[in-house]
Amino acid sequence: DVAPSRGLGDVYKRQLEYRPLIGVLTDRVHTPRAIAKRMMEYHLDRDYTMWVAEHLGNPKKEKIYKIYSIEEISEMSFTNPNCVLLMKAPNCALQRPALGIPDTKFILLNDRTKMITKAPIRVIDLSLLELHNSRYFWDIGACTGSVSIEARRQYPHLDIQAFEVRKECENIIRANTRLHSAPGIDLRIGNFLNLSIEKNTIVDAVFIGGHGGKLKEIIRKVASHLNSLNGKIVFNSVSEESSKLFREAVAENGLKLHSEINITLDSNNPITILCATGKNYV
């Protein structure tokens, strides 16, 4: 079966789902050349070969190009209308990557190893968020983008927004998304509390990786958008004070405390992974 796609975002979701055949309806913006360039940028060109058809169904103008090199396509132009068929490359297994990307595989902020959610913690966080049952995911305080990237690779269907206050993290996150073949993450740079979010926006899963001393305010804003039936918030606390603030904010906003997990990695301080749910969660 061919998985149909329209637009670059949909193409990448299909690729990250490891579909063997992907049909793409192109336009004057989402051209075969643009698709090929983007695939190369995110190292997705190794998994697929590309066919391009011009004027399909027109006996006088129809032309079909079977070209194995995505790089070659990235330098070519085609007449409109056209369409693309991506096919699994020979000897390509198309296997979903293992969960838990090693921390050493990420570009860090000023080489600060504590400014990343560690791989074992990251795996637990994503499990608690139940992203397989979610559609919209927010990563607040993304820093390196590790949580968003892991989510994108494991759950390609998600619409992901990553929020980060530090301007210097923008290039780091973008570089990490390219490095780990994780396109389609909507990155928003700025203070989460000051960023505009449409009133009727609903989010299913939220990870709070950083709060800048404004944890209660962040949870209050998140609570106003959280899916009341199956929404989840996960926060990694490294102090009793932040754990206390999280519990208080959950109660103040009519949410439910779902679970707590205490874990210690190596010689690091203990971490309490806290999970809250929407007010009508069952």
What are these regions (language model features)?
Residues S134-C143:
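Conserved class I S-adenosyl-L-methionine
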Residues V165-N200:
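S-adenosyl-L-methionine
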Residues N230-V238:
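Conserved beta-strand signature within the Rossmann-like core of class I S-adenosyl-L-methionine
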Residues P20-R112:
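A contiguous loop/helix-start segment that scaffolds small-molecule binding in enzyme catalytic cores
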Residues T144-P156:
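Conserved SAM-binding loop of SAM-dependent methyltransferases across substrates and taxa
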Residues D1-Y12:
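Single conserved hydrophobic/aromatic residue that forms the stacking wall/gate
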Residues D159-E164:
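Conserved SAM-binding motif I beta-strand of class I
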Residues K61-P81, S242-V282:
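Active-site capping/gating segments
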